Structure formats: structure tokens, C-alpha cells
């Protein structure tokens, strides 16, 4: 599923839409991707001589991927409520294709906990547990 599908679900827009497409999706799991381009404005400052995609944006990409999973059956604004066990394993550079794998691991009192893993060429570059909610419009 391409960017049109992503835009039909998420409220985010360029330059803060950090998911380019969805590879597969089920009720409790989703795999999405982001192509990392040197033309991304973030590389003007992070870091011009040796561009590295910021870890915080990788985590946001995982959260947006989780948002697609949550919002496909709901309407509202996705809320990023918390993060645990975040780890960054390897740098991400322009030309890389980030793969976001997110699965639901729990639901309680209107919140959903997910486990997210970001990979480049099947190597884990980051992972975290995220807590999300949906604010009704």
C-alpha cells in the first residue's frame, strides 16, 4: 500500500509524515517503510558533513506506523503517550530503506502498547515499546 493509503489514515503531512508505504498489515501487526533521502530537510543540520537520520525520527516513524494500525478502524488523532526500552543499535544514512515492524502487545483503558523494531537490510537499527491512544475528533 502506497503513500496515498498512508495519507488516507494518518493526519501527518510533509515534512513530518515519516511513513512512505505499508508492506503488510493484519489486525495486530503492521510492516511499513520509509525511504531515507539526502533531500530530507533534517540533513541540513543533522549532520551536513556526515548525515545520520535522527533516532528520535525513527521512533516517531514507529509511532506513526502504529498509528496506521490503530486508526484503520477508528477516527481521531493518534496520541504518543509513552516510550520504554528504546535502544538504538546502528546509524541510518541517506539511501537506506527503513522497515518498521510494529505489533500490539497489550490494550488497557483506551490505550494500546506496541513493540516496534526498525530495520535496514534485515539488521535491527532501533527498537522500543510505545504507548499510544486515540483522541476522538
Curated annotation (Swiss-Prot):
Coiled coil: none annotated. GO terms for cellular component: cytoplasm; membrane. Gene3D superfamilies: Hotdog Thioesterase. GO terms for molecular function: (3R)-hydroxyacyl-[acyl-carrier-protein] dehydratase activity. It is found in: Cytoplasm. It is an enzyme of class 4 (lyase). It comes from the Bacteria. GO terms for biological process: fatty acid biosynthetic process; lipid A biosynthetic process. The keyword Lipid biosynthesis applies. Transmembrane segments: none annotated. The active site is at residue 46. It holds the Pfam family FabA. Its main location: cytoplasm. Its EC number is 4.2.1.59. InterPro entries: FabA_FabZ (IPR013114), FabZ (IPR010084), HotDog_dom_sf (IPR029069). Keywords: Cytoplasm, Lipid A biosynthesis, Lipid biosynthesis, Lipid metabolism, Lyase. It catalyses: a (3R)-hydroxyacyl-[ACP] = a (2E)-enoyl-[ACP] + H2O. The keyword Lipid metabolism applies. Belongs to the thioester dehydratase family. FabZ subfamily. Involved in unsaturated fatty acids biosynthesis. Catalyzes the dehydration of short chain beta-hydroxyacyl-ACPs and long chain saturated and unsaturated beta-hydroxyacyl-ACPs. PANTHER family: 3-HYDROXYACYL-[ACYL-CARRIER-PROTEIN] DEHYDRATASE. NCBIfam families: fabZ (TIGR01750), PRK00006.1 (NF000582). This is 3-hydroxyacyl-[acyl-carrier-protein] dehydratase FabZ. The lineage of its organism: Bacteria, Thermotogati, Thermotogota, Thermotogae, Thermotogales.
